[in-house]
Amino acid sequence: MAKKSMIAKCNRPAKFSSREYTRCARCGRPHSVYRKFHLCRICLRELAHKGQIPGLKKASW
């Protein structure tokens, strides 16, 4: 889990637009966040396996 202070810091408007960064909407993780889903790779994988993200399924070939 992300620190509450860092999540609060991310929610404030940045002084410069280049300082803004994405965080996972579910756990607050700052790295490897998919913009389309606003989820990190770990949360995306968990929800996809449970079938909670419509239109997303695990690839198999």
Curated annotation (Swiss-Prot):
Cofactor(s) needed for function: Zn(2+)
Keyword terms of this UniProt record: Metal-binding, Ribonucleoprotein, Ribosomal protein, RNA-binding, rRNA-binding, Zinc
Gene3D superfamilies the UniProt entry points to: 30s Ribosomal Protein S14, Chain N
Pfam families assigned to the protein according to its UniProt record, in alphabetical order: Ribosomal_S14
InterPro entries: Ribosomal_uS14, Ribosomal_uS14_bact, Ribosomal_uS14_CS, Ribosomal_uS14_sf
Record-level Gene Ontology MF annotations: rRNA binding; structural constituent of ribosome; zinc ion binding
Protein's GO biological process: translation
Residues noted as binding Zn(2+) in the record, renumbered to the chain: C24, C27, C40, C43
GO CC term (a single one): small ribosomal subunit
Cofactor note: Binds 1 zinc ion per subunit.
PROSITE patterns xrefs: RIBOSOMAL_S14 (PS00527)
Keyword rRNA-binding appears in the UniProt entry: yes
Keyword check for Ribosomal protein: yes
Subunit-level organization: Part of the 30S ribosomal subunit. Contacts proteins S3 and S10.
NCBIfam families in the record: PRK08061.1 (NF005974)
Annotated family: Belongs to the universal ribosomal protein uS14 family. Zinc-binding uS14 subfamily.
Task of the protein: Binds 16S rRNA, required for the assembly of 30S particles and may also be responsible for determining the conformation of the 16S rRNA at the A site.
PANTHER family to which the protein is assigned, alphabetical: 30S RIBOSOMAL PROTEIN S14, SMALL RIBOSOMAL SUBUNIT PROTEIN US14B
Protein name: Small ribosomal subunit protein uS14B
Protein source organism: Limosilactobacillus reuteri (strain DSM 20016)
Record gene name: rpsZ
